[in-house]
Amino acid sequence: MASDEGKLFVGGLSFDTNEQSLEQVFSKYGQISEVVVVKDRETQRSRGFGFVTFENIDDAKDAMMAMNGKSVDGRQIRVDQAGKSSDNRSRGYRGGSAGGRGFFRGGRGRGRGFSRGGGDRGYGGNRFESRSGGYGGSRDYYSSRSQSGGYSDRSSGGSYRDSYDSYATHNE
């Protein structure tokens, strides 16, 4: 069981990447117990993904944070914890990294405040983009109040929304 904890999925590999080159790139983060590049059974050609297993789970986490999105053999790779598959990836990991955490926090109040008071009401495109823009569940958590407010105000007049917007923008 312990060996599975330090196991990383590495996707987006070049077909030229082999176990040796993958180990070389990841070995600077710690002791590696196993490297596998998954190959097609018939052609023996790389299928573009593999696994790197570290002896130590902390080394694996360091490698995952450092190498995700980096270029190996000319291809940008995706590194994730193996076995936690898409469920974990879409919620926590991609949600946190897609928008960049710093931009996320700093930009939320000011950026959303201005767009709420400005063109956001004029055309609904922004609202939908922000919901499906790869920011994960946390964005919905913050904007759920304004989301439902936005939809109900459209049909019932915007008095609450207008006062809220002017408060939000003047408050900065």
Swiss-Prot record:
The modification Phosphoserine is found at residues 130, 138, 146, 156, 159, 163. Its main location: nucleus. Gene3D superfamilies: 3.30.70.330. Residues 6-84 form the RRM domain. Keywords: Activator, Cytoplasm, Nucleus, Phosphoprotein, Repressor, RNA-binding, Stress response. CDD domains: RRM_CIRBP_RBM3. It comes from the Eukaryota. GO terms for cellular component: cytoplasm; cytoplasmic stress granule; nucleoplasm; nucleus; spliceosomal complex. Ubiquitous. The keyword Transcription does not apply. Methylated on arginine residues. Methylation of the RGG motifs is a prerequisite for recruitment into SGs. Phosphorylated by CK2, GSK3A and GSK3B. Phosphorylation by GSK3B increases RNA-binding activity to the TXN 3'-UTR transcript upon exposure to UV radiation. Signal peptide: none annotated. Residues 93-106, 114-125 have a biased composition (Gly residues). Residues 138-172 have a biased composition (Low complexity). Disulfide bonds: none annotated. Both the RRM domain and the arginine, glycine (RGG) rich domain are necessary for binding to the TXN 3'-untranslated region. Both the RRM domain and the arginine, glycine (RGG) rich domain (RGG repeats) are necessary for optimal recruitment into SGs upon cellular stress. The C-terminal domain containing RGG repeats is necessary for translational repression. This is Cold-inducible RNA-binding protein. It comes from Homo sapiens.
